[in-house]
Amino acid sequence: MKKLLTLLLAMLLLAGCAGNKPGTFEAGKNTFLLNGKPFIVKAAEVHYPRIPREYWEHRIEMCKALGMNTLCLYVFWNLHEETPGNYDFTGNKDIAAFCKLAQKHGMYVIVRPGPYVCAEWEMGGLPWWLLKNDSVELRTLDPYYMERVGMFMHEVGKQLEDLQITRGGNIIMVQVENEYGSYATDKPYVSAIRDTVRAAGFTEVPLFQCDWSSNFLNNGLDDLIWTVNFGTGADIDKQFAKLREVRPETPL
């Protein structure tokens, strides 16, 4: 009996490891490729801090039951760094635990670390204490702002970089900034945020940016995947057609 239990335990451990094998995710011609095969991203937006941790698994199961295969996660800066230099990724703020729970249910994750996330959240996720610096210019190349962004992104990377699909995790893409074209035109700033995201360790999965079709040309970077936003009631074909004009082979 003891040998049988040992064998069963070994089989379970091996099965768990098999589910966490390193993989690949990339943008191919007109489609995303998961481990080299066409993959349609069906994503649900889930805000982990708005859900009590004891209900996380239930919400993930609900998303999967709706036919989703991916979860999009904003990372709320002012949640994780309520005061300067004091980072908290525990309890209901444990985004890594949420990602692992999603993987348990066969779900992939798209990380959207901002630094600005909007999401009908206070200051779009930017910490209030940034404003204690009277001269700070948010969402610009302001030295103080960029320094604090870099420090926060580094902490996010420490939590999540090992969960990239290439390392056996379930993170398949990471977003750079958020709808910046609705705020300003500043490619150097968007480029700097891209570099900050990469410096945080997100170098093994595609990076992308999202904007409205009316302004995605303003800050579009050639080395990022472009995605287009549109509201309820929009002509979807028309919106995608605008993206196809400038990126004819981009995945939709």
Predicted regions and their residues:
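N-terminal carbohydrate-binding accessory modules
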Residues: 17-70, 100, 104-108
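Hydrophobic faces of well-ordered beta-strands that scaffold small-molecule active sites
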Residues: 41-44, 69-73, 109-113, 172-176, ...
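Aromatic-lined substrate-binding rim segments of carbohydrate-active enzymes
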Residues: 56-122, 128, 194-205, 223
